Amino acid sequence: MMLRRVVLAVGAMSMGCVSGASAQSNRYIEMGLGVNAAPPLVAHGSDNDWSTKCDLIINPLGLETGGECDSAPPRTSWTNAFGRGNGFGAGLAIGYDWGAVRLELEYLYRSTAYDDRSDTDIFDDVTLDKREQEIEQAYGEIDDLRSHGAFVNVYYDFGPSIASWTPYVGVGVGGERATLDYRSVWKRNDDPERISTFMDPLLRAKVAGTTTIGNARVSGSTLGYQLLAGVDYRLGERAMLGVKLRWVDFEAFEGGETLWSQLRSHESSVGRGEDIRYTVTTDDNGYWGLGVNLKYLF
């Protein structure tokens, strides 16, 4: 696993920093601002919903169900594949400089705007059957992904510390707390004649035009690593201005269970004594970041 290798590398380099410390070591504080670009993001949804026939709010008499509703069905599942995102970020770091090697603790904030809409891919048989006749539209939307992260970074500086230009590379491990605005919409056919879920025309009419809508702010914590490279320019004895490029990669994160805002145009329940809740999980997610940094040695 890449994350494990990075953790081991940071640990080894950190021990080297400590063992190589001398009276000439310098403390520093660094502030940065920049932009980020993220690759496509995939979100996976799942809930404990029953089929429309088993919804006792829609079908209180249990008509046309046979034995279909005798036991709880497997969880439904779906996926939305969204496009690329971009945004901005800011950071604050404190560190120690032991000549060629630096050890640093960094805080990062980022906001990545996707503002994208994606058709919903369905993977369970019950929902697939409804997609062929009952469900007219199914899509997901996401807005901004915002996160607060913390990293332990180790850098290697090339060239003497008194040089005007100092290129460097680095690696870091840490984690973030991410928040994602997610919306899921399932719209049923307005025309009852196109719905074959029920034979009864009154039940068809009751289902027609109903919607299932979820509006969630999905939050989760996850671990990750980053690879860094950049160059600093010495402005004076204690100040440096630099440009830094980073690739940050985080593991998947999962939000908690959330009630649907409405389920088939009624409350998030099927009248069976439990709420219907859904969860959203992302694939591994990451981003490229490019920033300008101001460093002060003290």
What residue spans do the PLM features occupy?
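Hydrophobic, lipid-facing positions within transmembrane beta-strands of outer-membrane proteins
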Residues: F88-L92, H148-V152, L223-A229, W288-V292
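Outer-membrane beta-barrel "beta-signal"
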Residues: N26-E30, D284-F298
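Extracellular/periplasm-exposed beta-strand and loop segments of Gram-negative cell-envelope proteins
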Residues: A38-G85, Y109-G149, F158, E176-T222, ...
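Cleavable N-terminal export/targeting peptides
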Residues: M1-N26
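Residue-level signature of outer-membrane beta-barrel architecture
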Residues: Y96-W98, Y156-F158, V231-Y233, Y296
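Repeated loop/turn-to-beta-strand initiation elements of outer-membrane beta-barrel proteins
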Residues: A100-L103, I162, E237-L241
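Transmembrane beta-barrel strands of outer-membrane/channel proteins
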Residues: M31-V35, Y96, L105-Y109, V169-G175, ...
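Short, contiguous, well-ordered secondary-structure segments
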Residues: A21, L145-G172, L245, F298
